[in-house]
Regions:
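Substrate-binding/active-site groove segments that recognize
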Residues: 123-144, 156-159, 163
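Short, functionally critical alpha-helical segments immediately adjacent to catalytic or ligand/cofactor-binding
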Residues: 101-116, 176-181
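Solvent-exposed, polar/charged alpha-helical surfaces in well-ordered, non-transmembrane soluble domains
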Residues: 83, 90, 94, 106, ...
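An acidic, Gly/Ser/Thr/Pro-rich helix-cap/linker signature
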Residues: 1-99, 230, 234
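Low-complexity, Gly/Ser/Thr/Pro-rich intrinsically disordered linker/tail segments
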Residues: 227-249
């Protein structure tokens, strides 16, 4: 894009007396830096747990581009998530590895709760947004005195148990992520009804249908923030007020 200069063109002043007055300032206007969204041809390289978009499947590639652009417009919020990721991923990553869960699942609590331990209107709570019944099923205490869904280490262990069980059902990490969002029974019904087991080609509700795309977008931006016009995590740590140490003990 050409650079724009705003200024007044001087007129010929031959044999005319010079006029006194304020000097005209030359104002240089440059366009704001553009955030780089990969072209459609490169979308297939993006992946979740090594599962990529179907090659040449333009519908999925366009959806991926749209979700990436949405994250770019949420710059301040995403910068805060960068800060939280820098602090809490070191707690989550070794637990995922111990259970044989792909590291990309660390982005689930980032998308689910923004790595906050709050309670949703539906009753889901904690970093991994467990419902009370599911939390108890996978070993978490949830009662009037204690809620281990808000403990990052314990809730991550519970999430790994659940995710591993889901993989035994679906044999696909993208389907596992979708089932984590909407429930395994719903996903099984959709797979049987549509006779389709490729997440990217399935017709799902808007939240679940965009869920894995959000995970991939968050992964892309956190791993390479400069490419998408964001600051590096260390430079935005001031946005994040650390949680109590009891959340990880």
């Amino acid at each position: 894009m050409a650079k724009v200069f705003a200024y007044n063109m001087p007129q010929a002043t031959e044999n005319l007396p010079k006029k006194e007055g304020k000097k005209t300032r030359i104002t240089k206007t440059t366009p704001p830096p553009q955030k780089v969204i990969p072209p459609l041809s490169q979308m297939a390289k993006l992946n979740f747990a090594e599962e990529t978009l179907p090659p040449g499947y333009v519908k999925a590639e366009r959806k991926m581009k749209k979700v990436l652009a949405t994250f770019n417009h949420r710059k301040i919020q995403t910068n805060r998530l960068h800060a939280k990721a820098a602090e809490w991923f070191p707690v989550i990553e070794p637990i995922l590895a111990a259970y044989g869960i792909p590291e990309d699942f660390k982005y689930v609590p980032l998308v689910e709760s923004g790595l906050n331990a709050g309670v949703s209107p539906k009753g889901a709570a904690g970093f991994w947004q467990f419902m009370p019944g599911t939390a108890r099923t996978y070993g978490l205490k949830v009662n009037s005195k204690v809620d281990e869904r808000k403990n990052l280490r314990k809730s991550t262990i519970a999430a790994c148990k659940y995710i591993k069980e889901l993989y035994g059902i679906f044999d696909s990490w993208t389907l596992v992520a979708a089932a984590y969002n909407v429930g395994d029974n719903h996903m099984k019904k959709q797979i049987n009804r549509q006779k389709q087991d490729n997440y990217f080609k399935m017709r799902l509700n808007s939240e679940t249908g965009g869920y894995v795309y959000k995970l991939i977008s968050m992964k892309a931006i956190v791993e390479d923030p400069a490419r998408y016009g964001f600051k590096a995590p260390k430079s935005v740590l001031a946005f994040h007020k650390p949680l109590s140490a009891t959340n990880v003990e």
